[in-house]
């Protein structure tokens, strides 16, 4: 079999099914990545969302016996919102990161990979494949870097010459020995804009990420957000794009190649106050198609409360008092009390004190006391 010709056939076919870039890499172990992951583990930089077995993350042979190569794919996504609604006093809005715009990208990339699998099986009935997107064992970034999709930027994203870092990544391990592509040389140079602007200092020189400090991770946690990060969330409901929007390689990059990825402006830049009391059914109907809904509504509601505090949105005080008094979830009651302390206003202190009289949760009581402290500081 002429595997170079097969590779060219696969490249040509990929363009007909909506794959923006494709690359090929050997399936040899990722030894350099292994050392980096061990270091991240030792430094406690991992988020907990990753595959815990470092061997599986770095050795494709453990995932597919007889693995010879890996096919990496990239799909470009939009970076600019058309007809974005305005956020104004009385109608404050939050924002979902670009990776949550449109249909859940996991579904979109799996569709492309399944089509690619079917094409290869038709050509080679005895082929073995294993595909994955984002939540698989392998590092999408390491595979894409090896396959020549792009280089690994200081913002810990794959940066492509064609689309910047606004790309979704997926890969397919196979026992077919495709000729590999060459990696792309790092083009970040001496630029450190992403590192300098990161709101929490999560990006570290050398392309390392302290995941537990990253706002993209913090917005997905379900508990009380540490107070040191609350003011840094801004109006982010899910995820963070700061290290991408500041990147010079992303200047002018905005691609609308895939209808499934087109965002609904009202969904990705939603009014904050209605989020506080949205029902499970309405949440699922409205946001269920987005990747940003995967953790459920509670983290997004907590972040909406923090965004209202960020804006010091006085019109939201009655709604926040309602959450503090009546919401069954301690995280939302406590976060609302803290937010009320940040916003301030007539009657807020009395509302917090009244709620404290019937509150039994120790963490919520701590947040209520903190809210009162913040109010007292305003009077000093």
UniProtKB/Swiss-Prot annotation:
<dbReference type="GO" id="GO:0052693">
    <property type="term" value="F:epoxyqueuosine reductase activity"/>
</dbReference>
<dbReference type="InterPro" id="IPR017896">
    <property type="entry name" value="4Fe4S_Fe-S-bd"/>
</dbReference>
<dbReference type="Pfam" id="PF13484">
    <property type="entry name" value="Fer4_16"/>
</dbReference>
<dbReference type="InterPro" id="IPR013542">
    <property type="entry name" value="QueG_DUF1730"/>
</dbReference>
<keyword id="KW-0479">Metal-binding</keyword>
<dbReference type="InterPro" id="IPR004453">
    <property type="entry name" value="QueG"/>
</dbReference>
<dbReference type="InterPro" id="IPR017900">
    <property type="entry name" value="4Fe4S_Fe_S_CS"/>
</dbReference>
<dbReference type="InterPro" id="IPR004155">
    <property type="entry name" value="PBS_lyase_HEAT"/>
</dbReference>
<dbReference type="Pfam" id="PF13646">
    <property type="entry name" value="HEAT_2"/>
</dbReference>
<keyword id="KW-0963">Cytoplasm</keyword>
<feature type="binding site">
    <location>
        <position position="188"/>
    </location>
    <ligand>
        <name>[4Fe-4S] cluster 1</name>
    </ligand>
</feature>
<keyword id="KW-0411">Iron-sulfur</keyword>
<keyword id="KW-0560">Oxidoreductase</keyword>
<keyword id="KW-0677">Repeat</keyword>
<feature type="binding site">
    <location>
        <position position="194"/>
    </location>
    <ligand>
        <name>[4Fe-4S] cluster 1</name>
    </ligand>
</feature>
<dbReference type="Pfam" id="PF08331">
    <property type="entry name" value="QueG_DUF1730"/>
</dbReference>
<dbReference type="GO" id="GO:0046872">
    <property type="term" value="F:metal ion binding"/>
</dbReference>
<keyword id="KW-0408">Iron</keyword>
<feature type="domain" description="4Fe-4S ferredoxin-type 2">
    <location>
        <begin position="226"/>
        <end position="258"/>
    </location>
</feature>
<feature type="binding site">
    <location>
        <position position="247"/>
    </location>
    <ligand>
        <name>[4Fe-4S] cluster 1</name>
    </ligand>
</feature>
<dbReference type="InterPro" id="IPR016024">
    <property type="entry name" value="ARM-type_fold"/>
</dbReference>
<comment type="pathway">
    <text>tRNA modification; tRNA-queuosine biosynthesis.</text>
</comment>
<dbReference type="GO" id="GO:0008616">
    <property type="term" value="P:queuosine biosynthetic process"/>
</dbReference>
<dbReference type="GO" id="GO:0051539">
    <property type="term" value="F:4 iron, 4 sulfur cluster binding"/>
</dbReference>
<keyword id="KW-0004">4Fe-4S</keyword>
<keyword id="KW-0819">tRNA processing</keyword>
<comment type="similarity">
    <text>Belongs to the QueG family.</text>
</comment>
<feature type="active site" description="Proton donor">
    <location>
        <position position="134"/>
    </location>
</feature>
<feature type="binding site">
    <location>
        <position position="243"/>
    </location>
    <ligand>
        <name>[4Fe-4S] cluster 2</name>
    </ligand>
</feature>
<feature type="domain" description="4Fe-4S ferredoxin-type 1">
    <location>
        <begin position="179"/>
        <end position="208"/>
    </location>
</feature>
<protein>
    <recommendedName>
        <fullName>Epoxyqueuosine reductase</fullName>
        <ecNumber>1.17.99.6</ecNumber>
    </recommendedName>
</protein>
<feature type="binding site">
    <location>
        <position position="198"/>
    </location>
    <ligand>
        <name>[4Fe-4S] cluster 2</name>
    </ligand>
</feature>
<dbReference type="InterPro" id="IPR011989">
    <property type="entry name" value="ARM-like"/>
</dbReference>
<dbReference type="GO" id="GO:0005737">
    <property type="term" value="C:cytoplasm"/>
</dbReference>
<feature type="binding site">
    <location>
        <position position="191"/>
    </location>
    <ligand>
        <name>[4Fe-4S] cluster 1</name>
    </ligand>
</feature>
<comment type="function">
    <text>Catalyzes the conversion of epoxyqueuosine (oQ) to queuosine (Q), which is a hypermodified base found in the wobble positions of tRNA(Asp), tRNA(Asn), tRNA(His) and tRNA(Tyr).</text>
</comment>
<dbReference type="GO" id="GO:0006400">
    <property type="term" value="P:tRNA modification"/>
</dbReference>
<comment type="subunit">
    <text>Monomer.</text>
</comment>
<feature type="binding site">
    <location>
        <position position="240"/>
    </location>
    <ligand>
        <name>[4Fe-4S] cluster 2</name>
    </ligand>
</feature>
<keyword id="KW-0671">Queuosine biosynthesis</keyword>
<feature type="binding site">
    <location>
        <position position="214"/>
    </location>
    <ligand>
        <name>[4Fe-4S] cluster 2</name>
    </ligand>
</feature>
């Amino acid at each position: 079999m002429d595997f170079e010709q097969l590779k060219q056939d696969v490249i040509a076919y990929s363009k007909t099914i909506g794959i923006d870039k494709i690359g090929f890499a050997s399936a040899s172990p990722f030894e350099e990545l292994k050392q980096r992951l061990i270091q991240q583990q030792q430094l406690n930089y991992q988020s907990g969302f990753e595959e815990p077995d470092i061997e599986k993350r770095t050795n494709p042979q453990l995932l597919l016996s007889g693995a010879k190569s890996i096919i990496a794919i990239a799909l470009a996504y939009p970076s600019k919102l058309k007809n974005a609604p305005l956020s104004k006093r009385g109608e404050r809005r939050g924002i979902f990161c670009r990776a949550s715009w449109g249909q859940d990208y996991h579904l979109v990339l799996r569709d492309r990979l399944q089509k690619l699998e079917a094409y290869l099986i038709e050509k080679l009935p005895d082929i073995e494949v294993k595909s994955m997107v984002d939540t698989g064992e392998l590092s999408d970034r390491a595979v894409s870097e090896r396959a020549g999709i792009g280089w690994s930027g200081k913002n810990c994203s794959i940066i492509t010459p064609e689309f910047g870092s606004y790309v979704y990544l997926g890969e397919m391990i196979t026992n077919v020995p495709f000729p590999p592509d060459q990696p792309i040389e790092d083009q970040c140079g001496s630029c450190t804009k992403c590192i300098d602007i990161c709101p929490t200092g999560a990006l570290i020189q050398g392309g390392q990420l302290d995941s537990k400090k990253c706002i993209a991770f913090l917005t997905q946690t379900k508990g009380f957000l540490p107070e040191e990060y609350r003011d840094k969330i801004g109006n982010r409901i899910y995820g963070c794009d700061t290290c991408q929007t500041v990147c010079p390689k992303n200047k002018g990059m905005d691609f609308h190649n895939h209808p499934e990825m087109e965002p609904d402006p009202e969904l990705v830049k939603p009014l904050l106050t209605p989020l506080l009391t949205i029902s499970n059914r309405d949440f699922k109907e409205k946001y269920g198609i987005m990747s940003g809904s995967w953790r459920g509504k509670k983290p997004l509601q907590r972040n909406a409360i923090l965004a209202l505090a960020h804006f010091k949105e006085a019109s939201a005080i009655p709604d926040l008092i309602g959450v503090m008094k009546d919401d069954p979830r301690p995280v939302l009651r406590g976060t609302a009390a803290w937010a009320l302390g940040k916003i301030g206003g007539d009657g807020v202190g009395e509302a917090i004190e009244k709620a404290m009289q019937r509150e039994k949760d120790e963490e919520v009581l701590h947040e209520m006391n903190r809210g009162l402290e913040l109010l007292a500081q305003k009077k000093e």
